[in-house]
Amino acid sequence: MSYTVQYEKRALKELSKLPATAVRQILTKIDSLSTDPYQTGIKKLKGFENVFRARAGNYRILYEVNDGKLLIMIVVVGDRKDVYDQ
């Protein structure tokens, strides 16, 4: 069972600002999330419903999961020190 991945505009904007090596690392992680969005190491964010955090090196991926539609919405991508301020 594979999930469809979609991106919010701000996530795409942040991805475009990152170095190519970081983007490759993040996209590899997102690809693995499409097969299992609840894999080991994933944490649910407190205070949000169905919003999770994945690590990709020093970067964080915040995403929502809709199991009914098999959809993962990438909400925010960024450096770990900045991503939670958005």
Language-model features and meaning:
Residues 1-24, 39, 55-59, 64-86:
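Enriched for short, Lys/Arg-rich terminal
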Residues 30-54:
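A short, surface-exposed loop/turn module that caps and links secondary-structure elements
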Residues 27:
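Detector for the c-type heme attachment site
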